[in-house]
Swiss-Prot record:
Its EC number is 4.98.1.1. Gene3D superfamilies: 3.40.50.1400. This is Ferrochelatase. It is found in: Cytoplasm. It comes from Prochlorococcus marinus (strain MIT 9312).
Length: 391
């Protein structure tokens, strides 16, 4: 029987406070997260941003226990999925490839080669495809595969996105309905989807399908929820986690919460639609920051739906995805990592840089000026930004 390696790709996260700075450096070193006009500036800029953000990020992680649970939860998901696949008769072993923290993709590749797997199924733990999540992970995997002749010999199939998969939708409906049932008036409970945002330019200039997939997914969940409950609920979609000076996908979560409070919404069911495991965005940003905003806005009952984690229906759905991937026409790593024709990725290509209104990424000239000012102040330890309390 062929030995199947199932590669689960995820973001990764710092497990200890001392990991926060290096994790941020890895994150911002990715040109699909922060774009610069010149390759030589990528890592210095990543160092600068991670240095400036490290203290604030450390405080956020301290508020949830001192580190991210994403590795532990992903390992639990991997074990449960492996057991489920073996129950179904597959000789499958799961492996984890984190993009920005341990265990890195290189480690998973080494383990799969050592275990002599006969075939690999790549399953990103992102239901929706985005340039900056699944896209980045696929492209990293392809780069490593292209440079490793032994790894290149192993047949590989990929799942690109799976937001419409029945097991995923059913598990979301089950978790949402649990929170709705706790409300005094279940039909009036407001379903509030919040997805991780991306810069608007990713969609409008780069052709990222993420926004459309998120919108389609929220409607699929609402339709399935209505069938499950026998009644419809009002619902809203927003985008969270915006950083930096550029415009991100709207509406922003914090602004929608304020509007819902003005509309006298009392029971709010918060659904983290783009997250399949608990981590900093659910435990700190939603549970602490957004809950406080909602309460100040007058929302009395703020109920956050748990992330899927190892929900049995979800794990069943993941196993079905793996089996379908093996049975259906192959999607190879070249196809999976291919972005829409509109997309231009640095360093191979560049989105438009210059003094124009269409550029939603940092203008290269401004970015370099800011970088130099900040770099000089960090080295010197004094300057106008220090006097203003920014550094």
């Amino acid at each position: 029987m062929n030995k199947i390696g199932v590669l689960l790709m995820n973001l990764g996260g710092p497990e200890r406070i001392t990991d926060v700075g290096p994790f941020l450096y890895n994150l911002f070193s990715d040109p699909e997260i922060i774009r610069t006009p010149f390759p030589a500036f990528q890592k210095p800029l990543a160092w600068l941003i991670s240095t400036l953000r490290s203290t604030t990020s450390q405080q956020a992680y301290l508020s949830i226990g001192g580190g991210s649970p994403i590795r532990r939860i992903t390992e639990q998901q991997a074990r449960e999925l492996q057991s489920k696949l073996r129950e179904k008769g597959l000789n499958a072993t799961t492996y984890i490839a984190m993009r920005y923290w341990h265990p890195f993709t290189e480690s998973a590749i080494a383990d799969m080669k050592a275990d002599c797997v006969d075939q690999i199924v790549v399953l990103p733990l992102y239901p929706h495809f985005s340039i900056s999540t699944s896209g980045s992970s696929f492209r990293e995997l392809k780069k490593l595969r292209d440079s490793d002749n032994d790894f290149k010999k192993i047949p590989m199939r990929c799942v690109r996105s799976w937001f419409s998969q029945s097991g995923y939708l059913k598990s979301m409906v089950e978790l949402i309905s649990q929170q709705i049932s706790c409300c005094e008036s279940p039909p009036n409970a407001h379903i509030f989807f919040t997805a991780h945002g991306v810069p608007k330019s990713y969609v409008e200039e780069a052709g990222d399908p993420y926004k459309q997939q998120i919108e389609d997914c929220s409607l699929l969940i609402i339709n399935e929820l209505e069938k499950y409950l026998g009644h419809s609920n009002p619902h809203t979609l927003s985008y969270q986690s915006r950083v930096g000076p550029v415009e991100w996908l709207k509406p922003y979560t914090e602004e929608v919460l304020a509007d819902l409070g003005k509309s006298n919404v009392e029971d709010l069911i918060v659904v983290p639609i783009s997250f399949v495991g608990e981590h900093i965005e659910t435990l700190q940003e939603i549970d602490i920051e957004y809950k406080e905003i909602a309460e100040k806005a007058g929302i009395k009952n703020f109920r956050r739906v748990k992330a899927l984690n190892t929900h049995p229906t979800f794990i069943e759905g993941l196993s079905d995805l793996v089996i379908s991937c093996l049975e259906e026409p192959q999607v190879n790593i070249e196809e999976a990592s291919k972005l829409p024709e509109k997309v231009k990725l640095y360093p191979q290509e560049k989105w438009q840089w210059g003094w124009n209104n269409s550029s939603e990424v940092w203008n290269g000239r401004v970015a370099m000026i800011v970088f130099l000012v900040l770099f000089i102040e960090l080295i010197a330890g004094s300057g106008p930004l220090h006097r203003l309390g920014i550094l």
